[in-house]
Amino acid sequence: MSNLENARCEACHADAPQVSDEELKELMREIPDWTPVTNDNVMMLQREFKFKNFKQALAFTNRVGDLAEEEKHHPELVTEWGKVTVTWWTHAINGLHKNDFIMAAKTDSVVDA
């Protein structure tokens, strides 16, 4: 269990700082299965999860949705047969905040729940 998994998201506003390059490297060590991606000049965290069927993929999607509601921080979720792609970023700052890394770690924790 990572330190990030046990952390709580903080309220984030438009003037909150994005993670620095140094913070990005450090935080990525705690979520090595995630990939930083850039979409429309916005850095995001993304991971694809594989499942045996649609039912398992949908159940995982719902677990991630429950986490998102608990923390009041919501991802992009693409649910397909046997696969869910989860993308985290902070809309208010158009980039990555520590909250995104916390939620990525929490997402990892519910894969086999």
From Swiss-Prot:
User: Could you confirm whether the keyword Acetylation appears in this record?
Assistant: no
Catalysis performed (reactions): (4aS,6R)-4a-hydroxy-L-erythro-5,6,7,8-tetrahydrobiopterin = (6R)-L-erythro-6,7-dihydrobiopterin + H2O
Origin, by domain of life?
Bacteria
Q: Does the keyword Transport apply?
A: no
- Name a Pfam family for this protein: Pterin_4a
Per the UniProt record, which EC number(s) apply here? 4.2.1.96
State the UniProt keywords alphabetically. Answer: Lyase
What's an example GO BP annotation here?
Answer: tetrahydrobiopterin biosynthetic process
Single GO MF annotation: 4-alpha-hydroxytetrahydrobiopterin dehydratase activity
Q: What class of enzyme is it?
A: lyase
- Give me the segments passing through the membrane: none
Concerning PANTHER family, the annotation shows:
PTERIN-4-ALPHA-CARBINOLAMINE DEHYDRATASE-RELATED (PTHR42805:SF1)
The record's similarity note reads:
Belongs to the pterin-4-alpha-carbinolamine dehydratase family.
State the protein's name.
Putative pterin-4-alpha-carbinolamine dehydratase
